[in-house]
Amino acid sequence: MEMGSNSGPGHGPGQAESGGSSTESSSFSGGLMFGQKIYFEDGGGGSGSSSSGGRSNRRVRGGGSGQSGQIPRCQVEGCGMDLTNAKGYYSRHRVCGVHSKTPKVTVAGIEQRFCQQCSRFHQLPEFDLEKRSCRRRLAGHNERRRKPQPASLSVLASRYGRIAPSLYENGDAGMNGSFLGNQEIGWPSSRTLDTRVMRRPVSSPSWQINPMNVFSQGSVGGGGTSFSSPEIMDTKLESYKGIGDSNCALSLLSNPHQPHDNNNNNNNNNNNNNNTWRASSGFGPMTVTMAQPPPAPSQHQYLNPPWVFKDNDNDMSPVLNLGRYTEPDNCQISSGTAMGEFELSDHHHQSRRQYMEDENTRAYDSSSHHTNWSL
């Protein structure tokens, strides 16, 4: 009896505990697997019940909110379009795609228009004509777009502020230089010289390149050939040797009956029509033919200018600021016209023969037979 009684109560609680634990574990595992509700009698059960109660409350709240905004519709009167399948933008702001661009709609009994930047309806006076955005938004947008940032302004000022003055100074200097060059040159406007006369700017004169081309520079103005810059001629004529008085030389050339020296009477008698002035050089004789005697000279210009020649030994420059270069021994220069064109001498052999005869008459005089060698 005692053993039974001992074993009974000893066994009873053990079996009860084992049975309770087995049922609890099976029910717990089954609840986790199949989603069944599990209720516990101890503290764990209370927490489970409270958690289940919280879940049910959340579901109720969610269901209520879902029911109130479950089907979004367009808020324009007379539309009520279902926006469930529309884009998120239209469903959020409760407007359909058509009425979002309509110029005038009625919302809550007021004529309004949907602003695409504000994403809400505004009254019509807040819009400008056909603009889809309100005036306030457009003003801010244009201000941000047109007004540069202060940082960009400072960068531009620091980057281009030093370059612009230098460019301006260079450009100004270039303009002044070209203007002064044009003033000094003074090219002819209507008539030009022969094509063989090369005209160059003062900045690179030809006599700096080749001194023999000093007489090929000139310009035509008022029927005469003259250098435009007296300072340039003064610097070049400092090294010249020859006649110092231009008026004296001009008077010698302009007087057809005044002899050049004591031994050239035959020369003047043979040339009654043209005034001829002969000069000898190492290359041969050079002849200048004047169709008319030149008139009284002005300050810097002559109508029919005499010509200037440069020789190895003697330099003859009747007029300081007038000049023309000729090729020796085979070229004749005629200034009968105002143009002063170049003419090739067709009778240079005759001129040389005549020159030799004149030299013979000079060399042997009737009174004294002294030899006069020309330089």
UniProtKB/Swiss-Prot annotation:
Cofactor requirements of the protein: Zn(2+)
Q: Which GO terms describe its biological process?
A: anther development; leaf development; regulation of DNA-templated transcription; regulation of leaf formation
Enumerate the residue ranges of region (Disordered).
1-30, 43-73, 252-278, 345-375
Compositional bias annotation for Basic and acidic residues: 345-362
Q: Biased composition, Low complexity: where in the chain?
A: 18-30, 262-275
Q: Which domain of life is it from?
A: Eukaryota
GO cellular component, as recorded: cytoplasm; nucleus
Q: What induces it?
A: Negatively regulated by microRNAs miR156 and miR157.
Pfam annotation, one family? SBP
Entries under Gene3D superfamilies matching the protein: Transcription factor, SBP-box domain (4.10.1100.10)
Co-factor note (free text): Binds 2 Zn(2+) ions per subunit.
UniProtKB keywords: Cytoplasm, DNA-binding, Metal-binding, Nucleus, Transcription, Transcription regulation, Zinc, Zinc-finger
Residue ranges that the Swiss-Prot or TrEMBL entry lists as coiled coil: none
Compartments annotated for it: namely: Nucleus; Cytoplasm
Positions annotated to bind Zn(2+) 1: 74, 79, 96, 99
Compositional bias (Polar residues) = 363-375
Residues at which Zn(2+) 2 binds:
115, 118, 122, 134
Zinc finger regions (SBP-type), where?
71-148
Q: What does this protein do?
A: Trans-acting factor that binds specifically to the consensus nucleotide sequence 5'-TNCGTACAA-3'.
Record comment regarding domains: The SBP-type zinc finger is required for the binding to DNA.
Q: Which PANTHER family match?
A: SQUAMOSA PROMOTER-BINDING-LIKE PROTEIN 4, SQUAMOSA PROMOTER-BINDING-LIKE PROTEIN 9
User: What name goes with this protein?
Assistant: Squamosa promoter-binding-like protein 9
Q: Which organism is it from?
A: Arabidopsis thaliana
Gene name as annotated: SPL9
